[in-house]
Amino acid sequence: MKLIVVAALIGVCAGGALPGHVAPQYYYGGPGYYPHGRPSPGVERNAAILRSDSEVTSQGFQYVYDTENGIHGEAAGVEANGIQSQGAFSYTGDDGQQYAVKYTADANGFQAQGAHLPTPPPIPDAIVRSIEENARAEAAGVYNEGSYNVYNNQAAFANRHQYPYQYQSNRPYNTLGYHGYKY
């Protein structure tokens, strides 16, 4: 009996944690390209808040915050035709570059501006000339909506009603439902 107890005690002690092996700490950074979260350094998870000021009144709101890892954010807004706000935020990217974004959000949507954000390509000269020509013609009272206008195209209207749909009464009633299943 003593032998069984000693063997069990040795087995429990030998089955303990392995020295030098540390279980990895996983951090979920939210949805995105990385299916298991964005890899991030430990400092980012535990960054202290250096400044956090906020005020909410019946006229609107404003807030400002700073963290020790270089993240800064500020915004102010009022309630008029929905919420109209403007603000900015900045942070240091994984590549060490400082990224800054200024934005407005109102009835026209969210509009962000930043040096690192993509910009649309320029409008081709031919399109610009065409828009200017259309504006001049409209100012002169010429309205050319193109050669096709469904409401003024009598031939298209006549062809559409040439063969009216007729109900076929000699067809048996369909007792089968959707995809052939009986109800």
Curated annotation (Swiss-Prot):
Record keywords: Transmembrane included? Answer: no
* A GO term from the CC aspect: chitin-based extracellular matrix
PROSITE patterns for this protein? CHIT_BIND_RR_1, CHIT_BIND_RR_2
Sorted keywords for this record are: Cuticle, Signal
Q: Per its UniProt record, what InterPro entries does this chain match?
A: CHIT_BIND_RR_consensus, Cuticle_Struct_Prot, Insect_cuticle
Pfam families this protein is in? Answer: Chitin_bind_4 (PF00379)
Disulphide bonds in the chain: none
Q: Which residues form the Chitin-binding type R&R domain?
A: 58-121
Question: Which superkingdom does the taxonomy of this entry point to?
Answer: Eukaryota
Say yes or no: keyword DNA-binding present: no
**Protein name, entry field:** Cuticle protein 2
One MF term in the entry's GO annotations? structural constituent of chitin-based larval cuticle
| Endpoints of the signal sequence | 1-15
Q: Which organism is it from?
A: Lonomia obliqua (Moth)
